[in-house]
């Protein structure tokens, strides 16, 4: 969703408001993975109107996207109830046809199990640790992302676009009504703590602000950026067979948040390592 919100904001701004590009140009740029359209890619990527920076225009687009998702869930719930749960009183042919599509025949769930039987739709927004794999099957997008590159992790800002600090990232969540998604809407933040200057109260204040800004699910970690960059270079040496894998052993204790779970930094794929390094913020 963050990629989509950023892309729509770029199209709104550069195509319809500033008339800097025309829509066929943008479409052709995406089809060609920005080859020959580097100016468009740079304009899209470097624009500051990105979700997670407390920018009202793109936050409003995100609110619309969440509204579409929520209303779609309500419609799916209604269709599911009509098709499987409730005992039909009309539209018998349509309901029978819908059941056939799902390879189901027979009585409604209420007829089988009683009126207390229900079907729960738990809506949420998340990628877990699959954001790199998901991106491999997605073409170039109008937020400046190239084909095959990772998408945003969970509901976090697109990696590398959180420019205004964690306070503004949290403020972007305030008016999105995330509590309506019972399966959760997760954000992952990694704070640079290279110099060890952040005390416990600093992290407590982030959690308090997250709650006050109506956040849903938060994973918060801190990292020594210099140390992780050094470990990444050692991983590169191992990957390129310049170093023995034994060179990684002293760093096996360094765990990072992947998305739904923690893992040693040295064990995650290169793309996820790069994503994590670019995610670290002040």
Identify what each model region corresponds to.
Residues 1-282:
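Acidic, glycine-enriched catalytic cores built around paired aspartates
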């Amino acid at each position: 969703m963050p990629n989509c919100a950023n892309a729509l904001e770029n199209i709104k701004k550069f195509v319809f408001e500033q008339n800097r590009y025309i829509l066929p140009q943008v479409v052709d740029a995406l089809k060609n993975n920005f080859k020959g359209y580097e100016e468009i890619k740079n304009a899209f990527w470097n624009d500051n109107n990105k979700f997670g920076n407390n920018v009202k225009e793109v936050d409003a687009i995100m609110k619309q996207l969440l509204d579409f998702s929520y209303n779609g869930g309500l419609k799916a719930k209604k269709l599911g109830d009509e098709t499987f749960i409730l005992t039909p009183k009309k539209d018998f042919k349509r309901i029978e046809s819908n059941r056939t599509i799902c390879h189901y025949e027979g009585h409604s769930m209420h007829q089988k199990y009683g009126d207390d039987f229900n079907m729960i739709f738990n809506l949420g927004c998340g990628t877990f640790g699959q954001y790199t794999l998901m991106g491999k099957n997605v073409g170039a997008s109008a937020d400046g992302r190239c084909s095959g590159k990772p998408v945003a992790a969970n509901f976090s800002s697109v990696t590398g676009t959180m420019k205004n600090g964690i306070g503004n990232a949290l403020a972007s969540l305030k008016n999105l009504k995330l509590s309506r998604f019972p399966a959760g809407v997760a954000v992952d933040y990694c704070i640079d703590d290279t110099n060890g200057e952040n005390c416990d109260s600093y992290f407590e204040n982030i959690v308090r602000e997250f709650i006050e800004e109506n956040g849903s699910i938060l994973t918060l970690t801190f990292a020594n950026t210099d140390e992780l960059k050094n470990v990444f270079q050692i991983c590169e040496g191992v990957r390129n067979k310049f170093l023995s894998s034994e060179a990684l052993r002293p760093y096996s204790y360094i765990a990072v948040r992947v998305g739904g779970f923690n893992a040693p930094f040295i064990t995650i794929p290169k793309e996820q390592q790069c994503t994590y390094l670019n995610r670290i913020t002040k």
